[in-house]
């Protein structure tokens, strides 16, 4: 078959790809990725539609090829060639070149998966660096959408016929809203979009292109409605609880967050009652279930942080901070906010248990959007934080450690190469949870953050350093969400024969792991010295 339209597509015209490779990649994308974000019109997945796809929607086609080609680990040059072209197209959009709704769709797809070919440097240990790229791609998508007046489709149309005319634009704009909210929640930034969102009375009938055409087709319209409702809850929680450092800190110290958190918990439970039994494919439903559990964690974790803030504000000057915090959290059941603290821990464990037991790593997790990998890491880091403050019992610690190990195994199985997100973040979890401290590792005594006033906020907004280079804890920080800080912490072990900190073995018997400074090299000294560790090797954050 001759593809006259496809022949004009730059990558085919210049010999980087053949029509057969393009068709194969488009089909692989449809089979593996499309179900998680069905932005590409279904008509483009037929082989006869490749010509029109290449002529009309070159941005969208290139985004599809960029994402799918990342799986061709034996032919990395294909992904590199497509990524270079994708980079040129994105630069063109940023420079104001003519484009249509398909460019917005392409940017949204890139933000969901962030193919490695678009980044200059990929570290072996994941540090959340994909979030920066996603943040920029979503921002460009929103600004382009505003320029194309996609926001006008946020309101219900007069008739079903009008709804069909603007269906593609409306779905693209609705996904701009979803992506904006979810990436902002991940990185703790304000929303890009403050205009009308898609929550102005829209329902499944407003997305006719997502509705099933034949028996057995996936009802993407219903799935997307559930996602919209959940995103609105994420948005509300972020706006009210995490809206700003000053207001959040005041709310923590005054304790007037209880009503908000209780109301949010009720709303989240109602979402579960409405959508918990949605009829769809299991690998799609599990993404909704995992998002629900992460929302529970995100909501309840605010109270956990508030209790830490209140405890620090009441600490006596002559009492060590670590001892004071462990004493406060030694009996969570007696605390007025116990239900929230237990709820956050339970949600984190539920999320990780779902990943370990209900997600096929090679058939499904491998192709899921990046946020589910990051939700996994956030949940694991949160549990590490809970352990640091003595919230977990000895039995819970052992169970959580086993669960983390299972998640590491699942993440690795999902990876096709060391550059895959699963492999990189599995390494981060391994460094954080599983590495025992060897004899000869130096010990840097903990400094009380309350004792110093010359600390500064780092560029990440979550780590404070004093004049001596030690990390300082601030009750207003939410650094269980700061993977760059976690990456900095574990980077004290860049080589296989070095250990960044004490793991579970040292936690159980810290007396066996007293350090000797003279055996530690300069690089490890430089890295570890920036962080506070207690005798159990716990990071204070």
Each predicted region: which residue ranges?
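Intrinsically disordered, low-complexity regulatory regions with latent secondary structure
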Residues: 2, 6-8, 12, 405-457, ...
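A short secondary-structure junction motif
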Residues: 65-77, 112-115, 487-489, 493, ...
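Low-complexity, Ser/Thr/Pro/Gly-enriched N-terminal "stalk/linker" regions
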Residues: 24-25, 29-32
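The first (N-terminal) embedded transmembrane alpha-helix
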Residues: 33-36, 109
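Long, low-complexity intrinsically disordered regions enriched in Pro/Ser/Thr and acidic residues
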Residues: 205-207
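Short, basic/glycine-rich phosphate-binding loops at helix/coil junctions
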Residues: 5, 60-67
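Extended, leucine-rich alpha-helical cores of fungal transcription factors
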Residues: 11-23, 44-62, 76-202, 213-270, ...
């Amino acid at each position: 078959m001759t593809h006259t339209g496809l022949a004009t597509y730059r990558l085919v015209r210049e010999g980087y790809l053949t029509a057969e490779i393009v068709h194969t990649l488009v089909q692989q994308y449809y089979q593996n990725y499309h179900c998680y974000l069905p932005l590409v019109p279904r008509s483009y997945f037929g082989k006869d539609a490749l010509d029109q796809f290449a002529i009309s929607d070159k941005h969208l086609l290139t985004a599809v090829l960029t994402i799918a080609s990342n799986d061709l680990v034996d032919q990395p040059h294909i992904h590199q060639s497509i990524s270079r072209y994708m980079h040129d197209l994105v630069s063109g959009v940023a420079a104001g070149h003519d484009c249509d709704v398909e460019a917005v769709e392409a940017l949204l797809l890139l933000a969901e998966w962030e193919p490695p070919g678009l980044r200059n440097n990929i570290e072996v240990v994941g540090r959340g660096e994909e979030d920066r790229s996603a943040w920029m791609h979503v921002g460009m998508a929103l600004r382009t959408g505003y320029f194309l007046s996609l926001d006008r489709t946020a309101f219900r149309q007069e008739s079903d016929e009008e709804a069909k005319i603007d269906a593609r634009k409306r779905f693209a704009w609705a996904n701009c809203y979803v992506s904006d909210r979810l990436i902002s929640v991940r990185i703790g930034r304000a929303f890009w979009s403050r205009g009308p969102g898609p929550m102005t009375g829209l329902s499944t009938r407003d997305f006719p292109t997502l509705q099933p055409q034949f028996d057995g087709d996936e009802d993407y319209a219903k799935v997307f409605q559930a996602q919209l409702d959940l995103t609105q809850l994420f948005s509300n929680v972020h706006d009210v609880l995490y809206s700003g450092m000053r207001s959040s800190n005041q709310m923590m110290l005054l304790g007037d967050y209880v009503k908000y958190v209780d109301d949010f918990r009720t709303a989240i439970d109602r979402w579960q009652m409405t959508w918990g039994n949605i009829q769809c494919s299991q690998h799609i439903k599990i993404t909704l279930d995992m998002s629900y559990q992460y929302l529970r964690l995100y909501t309840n974790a605010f109270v956990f942080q508030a209790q830490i803030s209140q405890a620090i504000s009441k600490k006596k000057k002559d009492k060590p901070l670590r001892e004071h915090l462990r004493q406060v959290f030694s009996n969570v059941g007696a605390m007025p906010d116990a239900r929230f603290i237990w709820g956050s821990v339970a949600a984190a464990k539920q999320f990780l248990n779902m990943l370990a037991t209900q997600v096929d790593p090679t058939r499904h997790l491998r192709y899921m959007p990046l946020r589910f990998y990051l939700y996994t890491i956030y949940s694991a880091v949160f549990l590490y934080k809970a352990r640091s403050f003595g919230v977990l019992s000895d039995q819970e610690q052992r169970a959580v450690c086993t669960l983390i190990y299972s998640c590491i195994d699942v993440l690795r199985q999902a990876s096709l190469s060391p550059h895959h997100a699963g492999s990189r973040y599995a390494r981060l979890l391994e460094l954080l949870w599983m590495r025992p401290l060897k004899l000869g590792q130096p010990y840097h005594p903990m400094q009380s953050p309350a004792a110093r006033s010359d600390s500064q906020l780092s560029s990440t907004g979550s780590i404070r350093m004093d004049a001596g280079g030690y990390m300082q804890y601030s009750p207003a920080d939410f650094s269980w969400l700061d993977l760059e800080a976690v990456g900095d912490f574990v980077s004290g072990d860049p080589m296989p024969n070095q250990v960044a900190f004490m793991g579970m073995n040292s936690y159980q018997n810290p007396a066996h792991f007293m350090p000797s400074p003279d055996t530690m090299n300069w690089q490890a000294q430089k890295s570890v010295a920036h962080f506070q560790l207690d005798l159990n090797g716990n990071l204070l954050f």
